[in-house]
Amino acid sequence: VCRRTGRLTAPRPIRTAPYPGFPTDAQAILMAALLRCRGAAVFEENLFSSRYRHVDELARMGADIRVSGRTAVVLGVERLHGAAVRCTDLRGGAALCAAALAAEGETAISDITHIDRGYQSIEDDLAALGADIRRVEETASP
């Protein structure tokens, strides 16, 4: 594992497609990786109509993402900040985790049962790589 400093340059447009094209399942996590890129990263979701549910939550962390229909444009920002966000699905949850690792301050992700469906003990794996992360049990409101 290595950590590279600096900002990535936005790639050419990313268009999801059936195999052997770019997998729709990787779209959210790649979007999170490009939140701080130089320039604009364009995503075109060609397989599912509701694959951008994580965008509003990423915006709470300072991401600049514009969605129009099946297209999302990520305008890279200098920094992300911690926020209280809600996981809406498995892949979006992974994207929130990735963005939280790059954000300044603390991020609290709720509804993590979505993440648990696909990533068993993700907090242990990320902590083993050096992340400052812990699981906190949610308490029910009276």
Question: Where is each model-derived feature located?
Answer:
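Short, structured segments at the rim of ligand-binding sites
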Residues: 1-142
